[in-house]
Amino acid sequence: MDINDDLNINSPVDNKNVVIVRARKTNTFFKAFKVAPNIWVAPERYYGEPLDIAEEYKLDGGIYDSNFLSQDSERENFLQAIIILLKRINNTISGKQLLSLISTAIPFPYGYIGGGYSSPNIFTFGKTPKSNKKLNSLVTSTIPFPFGGYRETNYIESQNNKNFYASNIIIFGPGSNIVENNVIYYKKNDAENGMGTMAEIVFQPLLTYKYNKFYIDPAMELTKCLIKSLYFLYGIKPSDNLVVPYRLRTELDNKQFSQLNIIDLLISGGVDLEFINTNPYWFTNSYFPNSIKMFEKYKNIYKTEIEGNNAIGNDIKLRLKQKFQINVQDIWNLNLNYFCQSFNSIIPDRFSNALKHFYRKQYYTMDYTDNYNINGFVNGQINTKLPLSNKNTNIISKPEKVVNLVNENNISLMKSNIYGDGLKGTTEDFYSTYKIPYNEEYEYRFNDSDNFPLNNISIEEVDSIPEIIDINPYKDNSDNLVFTQITSMTEEVTTHTALSINYLQAQITNNENFTLSSDFSKVVSSKDKSLVYSFLDNLMSYLETIKNDGPIDTDKKYYLWLKEVFKNYSFDINLTQEIDSMCGINEVVLWFGKALNILNTSNSFVEEYQDSGAISLISKKDNLREPNIEIDDISDSLLGLSFKDLNNKLYEIYSKNIVYFKKIYFSFLDQWWTEYYSQYFELICMAKQSILAQESLVKQIVQNKFTDLSKASIPPDTLKLIRETTEKTFIDLSNESQISMNRVDNFLNKASICVFVEDIYPKFISYMEKYINNINIKTREFIQRCTNINDNEKSILINSYTFKTIDFKFLDIQSIKNFFNSQVEQVMKEILSPYQLLLFASKGPNSNIIEDISGKNTLIQYTESIELVYGVNGESLYLKSPNETIKFSNKFFTNGLTNNFTICFWLRFTGKNDDKTRLIGNKVNNCGWEIYFEDNGLVFEIIDSNGNQESVYLSNIINDNWYYISISVDRLKDQLLIFINDKNVANVSIDQILSIYSTNIISLVNKNNSIYVEELSVLDNPITSEEVIRNYFSYLDNSYIRDSSKSLLEYNKNYQLYNYVFPETSLYEVNDNNKSYLSLKNTDGINISSVKFKLINIDESKVYVQKWDECIICVLDGTEKYLDISPENNRIQLVSSKDNAKKITVNTDLFRPDCITFSYNDKYFSLSLRDGDYNWMICNDNNKVPKGAHLWILES
């Protein structure tokens, strides 16, 4: 699909791509731009909402600005922003398929009388219809009415009603609230009855916000709206009342739940969806089966009445054909998880709109010219720097509750705001009224497949469909717009006991000058508003100790002070204590209790936690409701059955009851997730806010000290270096905070699981034991009453069909732990890996490729004469000519006073060197670190800006052998560790080393030697002896390829071959046009046979397969055949002669060492896109190894 980017707001009206149209049911007109078939953009504020809203109707977190998007420059920015976002979506296969479906998924046409279905309001525009080619063709057909025909509902109309333009969606600017996105259906009945209706998207592309460390990608926000529009186009909108309990609100005195709309839950992805997919019985609402029936109804009408009807134009028929290629289940399975991976984007791991309860949004201005393109943020979602929007001053603050903390005399000490989550709330206890169905079979199971739900969409076919030009308009295609104004009230409560929110607020100040205090009561009671609460005991002790020392007026004094501040902050914020393992928890975060007033008693936090257990951390503990259940008695009509027939019937009942027991188990699990885990998640969010508050305080203390220092007599160049070093330390402080956040997250997630295992699951077991006792009694009594079986047969049936405890032991700890390891978080881990540089070298078809695969986008410049030769485990850099150089540029390489780093690489030196010759380093103006050759040995040197220096000489490594060098700098421990291979050869104190702020460039240089370097990496953390040993031996061992069971891959041994994308579907031989190919089996009805694979060694001395080996692959299917490549279609074809087989290179994937790649002439074997019933094994033209379909698994 092409996105029309040749548009601007001054483009002339042509009644084709640029039109003036009427807003539905109004006399409002706007200029619309067609950016793709049936997809329009209107760079205007949404007409359906008033721009001036009374204060009482403005919602918390909203921004209301009636002047926004009123200038032509703003409208132009809006139009171009939407075009860029659509091009970004269209730049991926999955996004292109989504836009193709939206373009073709037209609402079902009204009024085709000849087909025998209803045609309400068919005569809508005067007494005679306008001349129309479609209508004229229908008139000449066998339709009994002269003006009969179908009419379309997906159109926008010109201001004079003369022209109609096909439209499935229109993208407007925001409505009243300029930071609220929304999707609005045209006609409610059609949105719910299977007919379908067009949609209006209300969208804000010019502002974005942050979640944790990353900016929200506006392309993902638009994708969310596009997915939602499909629910309306397909007519499968659920009732507004179809909501599920999302979390128990702990901040309210009564038991109140937040509820989440089912569409938002399905679309958002993340942990919420991961949890849903573990429970096949979550949804028992009739919406799901009814939607499927409605879809099948209209699909059947299309098949029987429209598909073969020559009176209906291809512009309609072919669109409906593509629409019905996709099932309703495919729409339900569409969520942001799929798109975040194909877009290489990060998304919030939970429903983001609800997170405003924990994170108050600040908005940033999007600059699409400099910071964004069709690949997303130019510098990534984390590293991009966007300016804060001036609209933030207008953010509405309407807390849901104000907590007034008073003393014993009822004098107010502080007021703290508790904000709502923006979700619908209810005091109804969902679990006390919900009855688990016994006989109803409409539970909906979500698809766990990795297959993209829209793979059936043919992009090529969609592109070839003629556009809809002649419209037969159905006038009643929309409802009247009703703008509902919602009021929000703030409730104030009084408490004598400080809550967590009070403790959190006491850690926040707007004052630049303040004093830290560990006495909360003193902070809130004092008239001195400069006191701020802190739990950083060691830092406060250090600051108290030095307060009477002399002024800090030199760079050295400042560096020593800053170093101690950093160390003490790191120690305090990451302080933990090991405990005897409690339900998998063997480490407790010590500051947690003091930070949020959790378990603050006369005992220590650890003692109280060990005494009271994990459930003591939350405020609402007695929430569990025993489920309402129903189970049918065994029918007396079975009493006279024979033993065989009765056995079969009882087995059916027994099996059905086991499934019902699982439903009961999942009901308990649901309650844990909604009512218990939601409280732990709230604590996680508050703890993170507390960490950020403490970090902010420390940074302000440092900033104040730097301001004082700048008044001293310090040279400008030195002051500039101090400023840059301080900024680098601020980054290191944030990194320490992130480590602490990770610990809190891990601790509280484990605590929540502990509650399920120790508190909730035993109650489930106890409940079930009572429940099955009653069932067993009834079963025994029934069997004893049976008249057509003997006593022995009765005994057999009683033993077989009475339940035991083992029948309902469903606890699976690992599946619960997996809730917190979603695909979204895995993307985060990949981007936030410790690697700042991970060098990868390979031979391309025309030149060598030397690149950074750490994900940190390092710029690499190198001398083209550098050769690649096979080294220890892959391609190594061979620098043999004088002054051959590789430069690595990245801001992450800039060192300072407090950051840790590690350098690792394999080195082989051939020659002799007496003079000092540089190898690699990051050093400018005699400040930084470097590694050089001297006296036939290797030297590591680190020197700071004050001239303090440490050098370590390493001998006996220049002898033509390979050595694994690891150098670790730990600034918290002031420790330098150096390893050669698996041995620690140096452990040196570097406590005298201060700032080594130098440059963002690391240079690898050869002067007059011959050197080989492989697997060069730079990490942002120190490395331990255990990690070095593991890396060293795994790297050596990694030269051998392994099968799926981690065993060494052997030549001449039979294996089953799977693709990484389809790990449970093996390859089969398929005959096509008298040639044999390999494919996945995608259709049960096709009779194709599974085959075995064998790798045949070219080097007969080899037993095991190593990386970069060349071999011949044999396929065993009765006879031996061999892999070749078809010159006609690049498919892997099978030939009978080994002489005609290709010599194929075998390797492993760097990130997935259990996966294998096959290549020939640097072209990799992969699976093709779906081709009818097949995914062929093909030889791809890409010269790099992408993920997914290019990866293979061999199973013995």
Curated annotation (Swiss-Prot):
Positions of region (Light chain nLC): 1-408
Gene Ontology MF: a single term: metalloendopeptidase activity
GO CC aspect terms: extracellular region
Coiled coil regions, renumbered to chain: none
Signal peptide as annotated in the record: none
Region (N-heavy chain nHN): 409-828
Role of this protein: Assembles with botulinum neurotoxin type C (BoNT/C) and protects it against pH-mediated inactivation or protease activity at pH 2.6 (the pH of the animal gastrointestinal tract) but not at pH 6.0. The non-toxic component is necessary to maintain toxicity.
Subunit composition and interactions: Forms a highly interlocked heterodimer with botulinum neurotoxin type C at pH 6.0 but not at pH 7.5. Botulinum toxins are produced as progenitor toxins of large molecular sizes of 12S (M toxin) and 16S (L toxin). M toxin consists of a non-toxic, non-hemagglutinin component (NTNHA) and the neurotoxin. L toxin consists of the M toxin and the 3 subcomponents of hemagglutinin (HA). HA is composed of subcomponents of 70, 33, and 17 kDa. The 70 kDa subcomponent undergoes proteolytic processing and is split into HA-55 and HA-22-23.
Name the UniProt record assigns to this protein: Non-toxic nonhemagglutinin type C
Protein source organism: Clostridium botulinum C phage (Clostridium botulinum C bacteriophage)
